[in-house]
């Protein structure tokens, strides 16, 4: 059968407020044994069985008396202890109530003390916040550059009037409130700098900077002297160059008319060189082809030898005529160059440069004719005939 909600609440209340009394339970236990033994004697159900605890013997009766007496004493001491505890609790409660009655007169004083304590705690909290702000500012000052704003009166008090005026003129102290009257003590000036270094460190830095500036000044003066000396030398060189350019401009104006003829002759020389190169390339190509043909037609060489000799004689005559014409052209160009050499030294060099390729071309032409003759009758005849046809 399930318990109701009321029964459950009663059980919980008993468990919460109940207290296990061990001496009382032990005393009830021994009383239960004595009651059971006397009930058995009265009802006549007492047994002489040794296995039962309720056996009526002198020893059991003496043990029951002793146990009952001891447990009674234990229970009595427990009751006395609880009685003393209750009395102490009542005394304490009475004293507490008496004190509460006496505190009613002192309650306003306690409330005023409480309010004062709260006020002091608030002041301590504000002081703590101010210390934190100062610590943050000190950390900022130690880390790098920061700004500091103070009135002019305080600046003059710390630094002096003359130094403050000097710093204001150098724009080191900058005015924060431009609307105030000028040169008044209420003006606020701001400074932005690194305050993490001490006076001794700043003095050493200032001394090292002064020594560096002096060294730089000496180096600049020495370099300035060198630059002035070099400038004089460069000025003289420039004047010499200008004079030389004026002289050359006059010579170029005189030789301007001769340059036109020289350009025309140089064009003719270039055309002659190109023509000779084409002839030489044709001769080389024909020479290679004829060498291949000679290897294929060695067995026919004996039958055609007489006819080729006659043609070779005719070709040699034509080649000699061409060489004579080239030599005549070279002599005429050499005479013209000699005449120009008397007029101007520079034009002489240019014509000399042009004459040299002609001589080289003549030498190369002679070498090619000589090599073509060494290759054999067929090759030389064919190359000579092709060169003659090209010249014509």
Curated annotation (Swiss-Prot):
Q: Where in the cell is it found?
A: Nucleus
Kindly list the cysteine pairs connected by disulfide bridges: none
Q: Where is this region: Disordered?
A: 258-392
Q: Which residues cross the membrane?
A: none
User: Which stretches are tagged as biased composition: Acidic residues?
Assistant: 258-271, 290-330, 345-367
Tell me where it mainly resides.
nucleus
Where is composition skewed (Polar residues) in this entry? 331-344, 377-392
Instruction: Report the superkingdom from the record.
Output: Eukaryota
Q: Would you name any one GO CC term?
A: chromosome, telomeric region
Biological process per Gene Ontology, one example term: transcription elongation by RNA polymerase II
For this UniProt record, the keywords arranged alphabetically read as follows:
Nucleus, Phosphoprotein, Transcription, Transcription regulation
Give the matching Pfam families.
THOC7 (PF05615)
Record GO terms (molecular function): molecular adaptor activity; nucleic acid binding
Q: Which residues carry this modification: Phosphoserine?
A: 266
Q: How does this protein assemble?
A: Component of the THO complex, which is composed of HPR1, MFT1, THO2 and THP2. Together with SUB2, TEX1 and YRA1, THO forms the transcription/export (TREX) complex. THO associates with DNA and RNA in vitro.
- What role does this protein play? Component the THO subcomplex of the TREX complex, which operates in coupling transcription elongation to mRNA export. The THO complex is recruited to transcribed genes and moves along the gene with the elongating polymerase during transcription. THO is important for stabilizing nascent RNA in the RNA polymerase II elongation complex by preventing formation of DNA:RNA hybrids behind the elongating polymerase.
Q: What more does the entry say?
A: Present with 5910 molecules/cell in log phase SD medium.
Name used for this protein in its record: THO complex subunit MFT1
Q: Which organism is it from?
A: Saccharomyces cerevisiae (strain ATCC 204508 / S288c)
Identify the coding gene: MFT1
